[in-house]
């Protein structure tokens, strides 16, 4: 639960509390020329938009450590900073975890 939105209303008023869970943050690791990355981008963007989750994309070629660690495994999806899926992204599973 969050803090009351309107302190003028009684605390037990249904209008005074929000119950929505915070949106997740999804990060997609990609690189140019990766056809699986293009497919994953479509899936991840749609799932994030439909669930109200934040989406960001990181090109692994801009960071030597990411390139070293993930060059053979992209695309990689992180949900809330935790590695979640790689290569062919399962849209149904992603939507389930973001719901």
Task: For the regions a language model picked out, list residue spans one by one.
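N-terminal leader/targeting and pre-domain segments
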Residues: 2-18
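Structural micro-motif
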Residues: 71-77
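Short acidic active-site motifs
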Residues: 62-66
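Conserved helix-turn-beta segment immediately C-terminal to the redox Cys motif
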Residues: 41-59
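Conserved strand-to-helix beginnings and helix N-cap segments that scaffold or border functional pockets
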Residues: 38-41, 67, 91
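Local sequence-structure signature of Cys/Sec-based thiol-disulfide redox active-site neighborhoods
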Residues: 15-47
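Non-catalytic, surface beta->alpha helical segment in thiol-disulfide oxidoreductase systems
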Residues: 81-99
